């Protein structure tokens, strides 16, 4: 439809040029009599009609160019189209200072030492003042320590909500050479999915799938003789 409109527009412009030439001829011959005057009137009428058609086609072409809220250059018409953007998570580099326990590590982040609490997971305690050392706590601590100490690259990934807890610890997903430590702990049955608070739950479903698999395989905290403590 747009191509046809442009074609007709070009034809209209050509007609206008021809009409102008005819008017010029009529003016040069207007002194030759009544016939010349009629010819002049005819040429003028053709020009006016052509200009009306060209104007109409031009408006139609402009309307076609902005159809669906996007003009032909690809820019959006804000009065017609509005897109809702979703904040994406991104990983940031950090370096290891030390692993504290199964779900807590201390990293150098943006030039400052910072303690991080792994999001959405909870491992058995090893240093709790009241609970003491819980079953599978040492195993979880050793697992996390091995992952982060052997990694050549450590990254942190904050979620969409609150970045720190009431103790000032960073709340994040921790990656060791591209592997999420949070998920690895859950998959090995060394952590449960816990402390889920929106909107800091982007990876919740992924973690729950890993937890379900660990339960199915009765790994560590989900083993038969320890299943109740993990519920």
UniProtKB/Swiss-Prot annotation:
Zinc as UniProt keyword: no
Matching Pfam families: SNase (PF00565)
Keywords linked to the UniProt accession: Calcium, Endonuclease, Hydrolase, Membrane, Metal-binding, Nuclease, Secreted, Signal, Zymogen
Propeptide: 27-63, 64-82
GO molecular function: endonuclease activity, active with either ribo- or deoxyribonucleic acids and producing 3'-phosphomonoesters; metal ion binding; nucleic acid binding
Basic and acidic residues: bias regions: 203-219
Reactions this protein catalyses: Endonucleolytic cleavage to nucleoside 3'-phosphates and 3'-phosphooligonucleotide end-products
Domain of life: Bacteria
Segments for region (Disordered): 61-86, 203-231
Active-site residues per Swiss-Prot or TrEMBL entry: 117, 125, 169
Family annotation (InterPro entries): SNase_OB-fold_sf, Staphylococal_nuclease_OB-fold, Thermonucl_AS
GO cellular component terms attached to this protein's record: extracellular region; membrane
Cofactor: Ca(2+)
Bias-annotated ranges (Polar residues): 61-73
CC cofactor note: Binds 1 Ca(2+) ion per subunit.
EC number: 3.1.31.1
Protein's UniProt keywords contain Calcium: yes
Function: Enzyme that catalyzes the hydrolysis of both DNA and RNA at the 5' position of the phosphodiester bond.
Family, as annotated: Belongs to the thermonuclease family.
PANTHER family per the UniProt record, alphabetical: EBNA2 BINDING PROTEIN P100, SERINE_THREONINE-PROTEIN KINASE 31
Protein name per Swiss-Prot or TrEMBL: Thermonuclease
Biological source species: Staphylococcus aureus
């Amino acid at each position: 439809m747009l191509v046809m409109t442009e074609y007709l527009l070009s034809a209209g412009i050509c007609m206008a040029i021809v009409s102008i030439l005819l008017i010029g001829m009529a003016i040069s011959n207007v002194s030759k009599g009544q016939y010349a005057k009629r010819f002049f009137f005819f040429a003028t009428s053709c020009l006016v009609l052509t200009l009306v058609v060209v104007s109409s086609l031009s408006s139609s072409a402009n309307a076609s160019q902005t159809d669906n809220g996007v003009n032909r250059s690809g820019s959006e018409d804000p009065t017609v189209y509005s897109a809702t953007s979703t904040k994406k998570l991104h990983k940031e580099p950090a370096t290891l200072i030390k692993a504290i326990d199964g779900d807590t590590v201390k990293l150098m982040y943006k030039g400052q030492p910072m303690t991080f609490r792994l999001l959405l997971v909870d491992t058995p305690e090893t240093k709790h003042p009241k609970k003491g050392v819980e079953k599978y706590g040492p195993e979880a601590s050793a697992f996390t320590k091995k992952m982060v100490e052997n990694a050549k690259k450590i990254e942190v990934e904050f979620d969409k909500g609150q970045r720190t807890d009431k103790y000032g610890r960073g709340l994040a997903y921790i990656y060791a050479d591209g592997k999420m430590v949070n998920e690895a702990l859950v998959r090995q049955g060394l952590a449960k999915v816990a402390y889920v608070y929106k909107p800091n739950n982007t990876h919740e479903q992924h973690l729950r799938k890993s937890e379900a698999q660990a339960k199915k395989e009765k790994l560590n905290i989900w083993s038969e003789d320890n299943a109740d403590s993990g519920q």
